[in-house]
Amino acid sequence: MKICDLTQFYSPVSGGVKRYLHEKIGYIDRHAHRDEHVLIVPGAKTKLKANGRSRVYTIRSPVVSRTAQYRALLNLRAVEEILDRERPDVIESADPYQLGWKALTVGRALAVPVVGFYHSHFPEAYVRKSAMLLGKTATHRVMKLSRAYVRKLYNQHAATIVASDLLGRVLRDWGVHNVRVLSLGVNPEIFRPDGSESEAIRRSLGVRSGQKLLLYVGRLAKEKNTATLLRAFKTLERCRPNEFHLLVIGDGPDRTQLRKLQLRTDNLSWIRYCTDPCELAGFYRAADLFVHPGVQETFGLAALECQACGTPVVGIRGSYMDNVICHDQESWAVENSPDALANAIEDCGDRKLSVMGRNAARVARSLYSWPRVFDELFCIYRELRSKYRRLNAER
């Protein structure tokens, strides 16, 4: 079976979607010896990189985000030519925009199933916040249109994959009829408890003895709710000075707020990028508490990875990633506000975090593994391929 993935959410410094795709390539290499993989992504120049049964096509595309280094894949003719040449058995699209529609068009021409992976809940993460500037009536109309768009696009796919039960229920309520829930995973060889380097990492960051190290990993952007995190930390600095140190790993439009806060305190460290999973795992393990302010996450891969490393998570209740939290959420914020998040961090800081972390690591490693994820996903692929072959034979 030959699988082709298409996405625009891919760059030298991108996170969850890229991790998922690379883990899939690794799974095929180690476990699916009769399968092939093709990946089509935007990049600085057009090129092909082949490695065994994996091929990565990069298509020259313009930059749309300099911090995240995302690019818009506009050369759809090149995409069509690659798909026509490769003739995949299954196409998976991780794009709700022009690339997603092109995948459907080519899939129909090749008579193969197109699977949509709903990685980004864009109507809530992007559309609603922009529409709110126009007032309540306009917001209601825009959201109604965005739900209709999601319904029209994804009902044309053979299946729509989502990473959480709650998000799956949302899409079903919107009228998407082909939803399949598939949790993501962790690599237990990399993301595991191991405190051998933690003290050295903490010293390199300037974390004082007795301080609790808070960690955030992700983009600094509105859709990630990082402004709430920074204001919450500002509150902690005022109310409980020098008790916490915050490490932020990531970049984005909200970096200006972060830099301003850095000028006011020595208890804030910033690393713009960390693309090495092993290095990232070291930061996860060195932290006492992972702070996840996002309320529109479709899964929360970073939260799962840090738990697998033995570090508990605090955040805001009610997001789509609640089901991957492997410990109780008693201390979590009950509303999306800086004060509520600051109080939640304080409450968690008074608990036995190491015990919570060890328990969470055991659960994360037992329930979430990439081989298990891809075993299930490839069953879906084979089911859809067989269905399409039967339909094509009957025509």
Which residues fall in each region the model found?
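N-terminal subdomain of nucleotide-sugar transferases
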Residues: 1-52, 57-58, 392-395
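Short alpha-helical donor nucleotide-sugar binding micro-motif in glycosyltransferases
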Residues: 154, 282-287
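Carbohydrate-associated surface elements
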Residues: 166, 185
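Conserved donor-binding/catalytic core segment of Leloir-type glycosyltransferases
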Residues: 208-233
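Nucleotide-activated donor-binding/catalytic signature segment of Leloir-type glycosyltransferases, i.e.
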Residues: 256-278
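Aromatic "clamp/platform" in nucleotide-sugar-dependent glycosyltransferases that forms part
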Residues: 295
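Short hydrophobic beta-strand element within catalytic cores of glycosyltransferases
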Residues: 312-315
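Conserved acidic donor-binding segment of nucleotide-sugar-dependent glycosyltransferases
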Residues: 327-339, 346-351
